[in-house]
């Protein structure tokens, strides 16, 4: 893939026109011929309809690249057979970002439970250290929507299994896998496929990169089958338990949220971050909306909104501490 060096117009099909699809179109359309397709044409706004291509026409069009949105399931969509025949052309907005910005420092956070909270907390920590930091991916803006990116910009990327599964070229300076439990198996079919999608952010790393990974036998077994070049650091659940007495924020009393802090403490050593600043930021951190959010509390009743949770395994530890 030579996207960065190509100045002549290329044909792009952007499949799926949610936030990531719109940002991909805006990013690519100046120097390339772009077409869009969505299973639900009605949701495409009038100002973008001039880019729409019908299914019958796109099937006879020779696209150079197919940019697919994470919400598209190749096995259950209108273009299923077409995508399977052209899998080598399928890329993501993550791939486009990396090819145009290979020098930008990226920190990718994935896993099953607590990705958003961990990503937002890291973003806050880096901002407190006065870094030009962007929060993107599955939280914040789509990655291609960020402007005025320089070599000093740091991207904190929350990556879901859906976003990583279709990526072909994206890699990250720091890749963090915070925990793994069964999730989205209706899409990935097997636990192995689900974990392999997460490992994509590690497999493409080089010798100068670092992967900070939960101490899981399944992850270790799968990594042994790959030619891993980066430095792998396995983090146990209580590696930094000695720092727990410095925390006053009740949101990190449950086991999952505290365990996920271990990965940020480990990362801080490699980035030479100030521990006092980290602790202060953690203690002032407010929970994200709809994530383990206490919306009512009395002597006899507590109502918790955890509607953003995608699995029961993320909710149970919070209930156990409340």
Segment roles from a protein language model:
Residues 34-39, 134-135, 156, 234:
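Short beta-strand "acidic-cap" motif of Rossmann-like dinucleotide-binding folds
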Residues 3-11, 21-27, 132, 250-322:
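Nucleotide phosphate-binding/pyrophosphate-handling subdomain across enzymes
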Residues 18, 40, 139, 215-217:
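Residues in the short beta-alpha loop(s) of Rossmann-like NAD(P)-binding domains
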Residues 1-92, 96, 273, 310-313:
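N-terminal leader/targeting and accessory segments in enzymes
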Residues 19, 113-117, 258:
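Residue-level detector of alpha-helix initiation sites
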Residues 93-96, 227-242, 279-283, 293:
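Beta-strand->loop->alpha-helix junctions that form or flank phosphate-binding loops
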Residues 239-251:
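Short amphipathic alpha-helical segments and their helix-coil junctions
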Residues 10-11, 26-29, 59-63, 70, ...:
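Phosphate-binding loop of NTP-binding sites
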């Amino acid at each position: 893939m030579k996207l960065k060096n190509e100045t002549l117009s290329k044909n792009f099909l952007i499949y799926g026109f949610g936030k990531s699809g719109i940002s991909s179109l805006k990013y690519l359309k100046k120097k390339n011929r772009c077409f869009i397709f969505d299973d639900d044409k009605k949701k495409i706004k009038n100002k973008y309809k001039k880019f729409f291509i019908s299914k019958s026409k796109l099937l006879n069009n020779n696209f150079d690249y197919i940019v697919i949105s994470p919400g598209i399931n190749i096995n259950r969509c209108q273009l299923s057979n077409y995508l399977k025949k052209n899998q080598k052309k399928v890329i993501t907005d993550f791939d486009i970002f990396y090819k145009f910005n290979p020098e930008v420092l990226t920190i990718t956070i994935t896993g099953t439970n607590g990705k958003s909270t961990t990503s937002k907390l890291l973003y806050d920590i880096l901002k407190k250290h006065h870094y030009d930091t962007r929060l993107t991916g599955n939280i914040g803006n789509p990655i291609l929507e960020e402007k005025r990116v320089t070599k000093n910009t740091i991207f904190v990327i929350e990556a879901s299994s859906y976003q990583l599964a279709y990526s072909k070229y994206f890699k990250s300076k720091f890749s963090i896998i915070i925990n793994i439990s069964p999730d989205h198996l209706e899409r990935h079919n097997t636990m192995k496929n689900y974990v392999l999608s997460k490992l994509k952010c590690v497999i493409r790393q080089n010798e100068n990169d670092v992967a900070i990974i939960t101490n899981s036998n399944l992850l270790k077994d799968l990594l042994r089958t790959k030619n891993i070049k980066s430095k792998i650091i396995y983090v146990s659940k209580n590696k930094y338990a000695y720092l727990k007495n410095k925390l006053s924020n009740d949101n990190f009393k449950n086991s999952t949220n505290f365990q996920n802090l271990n990965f940020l403490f480990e990362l801080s050593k490699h980035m030479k971050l100030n521990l006092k600043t980290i602790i202060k930021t953690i203690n002032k951190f407010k929970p994200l909306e709809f994530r383990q959010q206490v919306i009512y509390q009395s002597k006899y009743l507590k109502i918790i909104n955890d509607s953003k949770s995608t699995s029961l395994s993320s909710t149970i530890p919070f209930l156990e501490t409340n």
